[in-house]
A protein has these predicted regions:
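Long, contiguous internal "core" modules enriched in hydrophobic/ aromatic residues
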Residues: 1-155
Length: 155
């Protein structure tokens, strides 16, 4: 039997997300979440679902940049200073929830990557790319006006 890391490298992102969701050992799920810098397994499961959804849009050449995602990030208090929060209807009531734009997914991805590798170039490359876009395009992607001054994007 090959080591687990070999198996996971052969999985698609969707398969990995579903495999994680079907894992019964919550201690393992919590350990993986902590290893990625996320507070708990529920947040990791929701984040994996969103990232899998976004990956599929990209893989099938779908329009992503100005699209609201069907999946929404879970509330992550640790990242609240960076996330764009909106009032959303949840289970018949109105709650503060992360907005379902690509911006919030990029925030969580940046935090996860930095947690794994402090010297990741993802944040710098994302900033460089985003700064080539117009204010209207940034707004359509859910970027707040002050995005560059938020902690996540400090370089």
């Amino acid at each position: 039997m090959p080591p687990l890391w070999v198996v996971t490298e052969l999985m698609t992102f969707g398969e990995l997300s579903r495999w994680f969701a079907l894992t019964k050992d919550n201690k393992v799920k919590s350990a993986v979440a902590m290893d990625l810098g996320l507070p708990n397994r529920e947040v990791l499961e929701g984040t994996l679902q969103l990232l899998s959804y976004i990956r599929n849009i990209c893989a099938h050449h779908g329009r992503l940049w100005n699209r609201q995602t069907v999946k929404r990030l879970p509330n992550i208090k640790r990242f609240r200073a960076d996330l764009v929060i909106v009032e959303a209807v949840v289970d018949g009531g109105v709650q503060a929830q992360p907005a379902n734009f690509i911006y919030n997914a990029l925030v969580v991805l940046a935090y996860m990557l930095r947690h794994q590798s402090a010297d990741t170039s993802f944040v710098q490359r994302a900033v460089d790319l985003v700064q080539t876009r117009s204010a209207e395009q940034l707004k359509a992607m859910g970027f707040p006006i002050d995005w560059r001054s938020r902690p996540c994007w400090s370089i």
